[in-house]
């Protein structure tokens, strides 16, 4: 319910308690669950880009969980709000209820760009830190000539920022809102898997504070200091990486995100701040 004007979305007991319509809604959802609960890998989202009342999603979350329990299934639930501002009160309806929603979906952050996009995600990460939950971005928007005025580059940047910031999952949204699995999307995913072959991404955390001489949106870093550093450059540039308190030598390996292929290699030694410059402009 994007505009949330349709009575269909006000039927639950704590709303308008429309028992006539609710009976059919429950039968429909129960029929869907007859099929989906046969499988253990299904994630359940109560709505798509909703502006609905909190009671609407809460009712269906309880309904799904109860039916799952009857089948001996543990299910994982969330709600997807339409507000592009992740700091908005509406998102707290999910963030503040880990007993109801097992993970969060912050896809609407993908309407934002650059440093703001990164900072918003980290805000949610910190907000959830007392009771961490997976943060998914099921819809990565960004494709040339889409209805939002985005570009292909926007989609690639959003994917990689979320990857280094700690998202549990990222997916390029379907064309024309996103790249889908076109050549650029596939290359970016391949590059991410190549990075993962070197650095388990769950072993590093956002660490832009280790970067120096950095402009907004110039480079992004996730690190396990002294062990591994994963850096993303959206459009070339040059920054310093603070290795002053670190001993030893590190292998520097570049991945060309445009092609999903390995790039040049080098060595870095600890004990100082080291300049890092990607091989060319573009996504590295």
Predicted regions: what is each one?
Residues 29, 57, 61, 121, ...:
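Amphipathic alpha-helical segments in well-structured domains
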Residues 43, 74-76, 132-135, 168:
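Proline-centered loop/turn at the N-terminus of a beta-strand
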Residues 50, 88, 101-109, 118-153, ...:
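Active-site clefts of carbohydrate-active enzymes
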Residues 46-49, 80-83, 106-110, 138-142, ...:
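Active-site-proximal beta-strand/loop segments in catalytic clefts of secreted hydrolases
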Residues 134, 142-146, 151-266, 275-284:
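Aromatic- and carboxylate-lined catalytic core of secreted/periplasmic carbohydrate-active enzymes
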Residues 93-104, 160-169:
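Structural recognition of alpha->loop->beta junctions
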